[in-house]
Amino acid sequence: MKLKVYADRMSQPSRAVLIFCKVNEIQFDEILIYLANRQQLSPEFKDINPMGKVPAIVDGKLKLSESHAILIYLSSAYPSVVDHWYPTDLSKRARIHSVLDWHHTNLRPGAAGYVLNSVLGPALGLPLNPKAAAEAEQLLTKSLTTLDTFWLKGNAMFLLGSNQPSIADLSLVCELTQLQVLDDKDRLRLLSPHKNVEQWIENTRKATMPHFDEVHEVLFRAKDRCQKQREMATASKPGPQSKIIQFSTIGEKSDDPNLVQNTTDRRKHRRKWSRAEDAILISAWLNTSKDPIVDNEHKACAFWKRIGAYFNNSASLANLPKREPSHCKQRWSKLNDKVCKFVGCYDQALNQRSSGQSEDDVFQVAYQVYTNNYKSNFTLEHAWRELRHSKKWCSLYPFENSKGGGSSKRTKLNNGDRVYSSSSNPESVPIALDEEEQVMDLPLGVKSSKQKEKKVATIITIEEREADSGSRLENLWVLDEEEQVMDRPLGVKSLEQKENKVAPKPTIEEREAADSRSRLENLWALKEKEEREADSRSRLENLWALKEKDIEEQKKLTRMEVLKSLLGRTTDQLSEKEDILKNKLIDEML
């Protein structure tokens, strides 16, 4: 059976295994596992590697993970592998093992930790952490010094005084090439003091060409994207002598051809949205309409201007270029569409949930349903987790039609928005149309308050009329009794006593007025009870959502605090379990 290699080329250990197989002409099938799409957590891949990490291989009946173990196995199992990669000499093998063990506890935490906390954090939904980056940089600098003065001592081209590369050379070089995503000045600041290290990286690259550059092509493209984003961020902060090019439908024209060309180039460039930006956009959409609105004719264009202002004023995005309101609207439309579709898939998976299945298992089933239905991967899990418990979002985008098979038609939501429901896809969900044309609704509190005031005024008016009518009837009744007393003959005591014993019967108008008052009192009491219950339910739902979010944030902060404390200690101060925990936390961050 042909060897299968499960890898993601943005992963340093994955690149080492792929280059090794290609250089030694080992026939294999490469199966891509995209970490950004959480494919490593799928049930199919966890059957191969229960830890859910890449790389992993399947060779016949053997399923193996951990890049160092994979490289050792391939070197021993395949005759085409040249001896210098993993020598048969036991003393040389032992020294290679010592380098590999040192790599996992020194160079990898330093290099990976610095890149994560200074560049790649936002791409993974984590904030940049200058303090953690500084601590990782100290470990990286120390590791580079050890590499330069101990492992590369002498005039040899490779580690341990060898003139040919080993699996240790390949593994460590792939680790350091991850620094390519840094700014050029930052990378040179770290590597330039270590000339032996720079020459050794180049020697390993040449020894494994052309496969080295081919496997690293994904990383080089990521480097170019990071560099362009840094250039855009610099261009968005003009100095006192620079010229600002205005981008608007009514902007001023420029006679300078260079400015016109620069404007065209900047318009062509499209900056991708990070998870952190998505989180701020969702927060802006959820919170903006809660502000006081003084006019019922509040158009959607003004609404998106306010969302754009909310987004651009966020402190966590201060170092990034500003987004236009139209950009926010386009991103929200795309994000909302995909999340709505995934909700339908998740509901379907939830209905088919069997006993023993966890929430992660249900998510994986929903992910597979989405992939099968829409022929693409669902990459917005972070947005789905933010919106799924939002009362406002759920009320505006109901999902009763997501499982139906009715005809394709437009319907109306509670707020009057037009939606489109298609029968061609049983998992289709309603999507709001014509956002620019619709008039924004007033906040729920304002409308309900106005309706309540109108109802109270109506009830008070009815009660006042009934009270006035009852008062007039009582006055007429008293006058009638006085007239009867005046007309009675004197001395007729027996008749007078008989009439006093008989209670006066209410008129039809009195009975109707009393019944009306009773019904109104009952209706008003029932209405107040319903409002109290609804308000109580709303508060409980909000508290529960906040509690869940706080728990998740607390878990994340706890893991980061544990990792920071472990990174602040030297290897000699860590027990074996603490060392394993530190490496596991670093891998989770990446």
UniProtKB/Swiss-Prot annotation:
Transmembrane segments: none annotated. Residues 265-336 form the Myb-like domain. Pfam families: GST_N. One of its GO terms (cellular component) is cytoplasm. Residues 1-82 form the GST N-terminal domain. It is found in: Nucleus. CDD domains: GST_C_Theta, GST_N_Theta. Glutathione binds at residues 11-12, 40-41, 53-54, 66-67. GO terms for molecular function: glutathione transferase activity. It catalyses: RX + glutathione = an S-substituted glutathione + a halide anion + H(+). Residues 89-232 form the GST C-terminal domain. Keywords: Detoxification, Nucleus, Transferase. It is an enzyme of class 2 (transferase). Gene3D superfamilies: 1.20.1050.10, Glutaredoxin, Homeodomain-like. The keyword Flavoprotein does not apply. Its EC number is 2.5.1.18. Residues 402-427 are annotated as: Disordered. May be involved in the conjugation of reduced glutathione to a wide number of exogenous and endogenous hydrophobic electrophiles and have a detoxification role against certain herbicides. Belongs to the GST superfamily. Theta family. PANTHER family: GLUTATHIONE S-TRANSFERASE T1-RELATED. This is Glutathione S-transferase T3. The gene is GSTT3.
